[in-house]
Amino acid sequence: MRWRPSSWSAVRLRRGRSSGCPIVVGKMPAEPADLDRDGYPAGRGRASVEGEGGRHADRHGGPQAQELPHDQRPADQEQCGQHCR
């Protein structure tokens, strides 16, 4: 089967979303608490409140979408590990 332009655009959108928050995609079903702090809804809300692009930046994996999770990732992982156990 050959790729069609419409399917290519869908693949780009998926890659952009997943690249914004790589850890959230893996932890989504297991740890919903991660989503509230650092996940897609939280990250999207921060970006839109601060006026740094909002959903558009997150959807394409912009710099704001990548910086927010990276800055708070280690602390959240440690806390989440303690709470979950």
Curated annotation (Swiss-Prot):
Query: What are the Basic and acidic residues biased-composition ranges?
Result: 47-61
Q: Which UniProt keywords apply?
A: Plasmid
Q: Where is this region: Disordered?
A: 1-85
Highest taxon, organism lineage: Bacteria
* UniProt-recorded name of the protein: Uncharacterized 9.4 kDa protein
Instruction: Give the originating organism.
Output: Streptomyces lividans
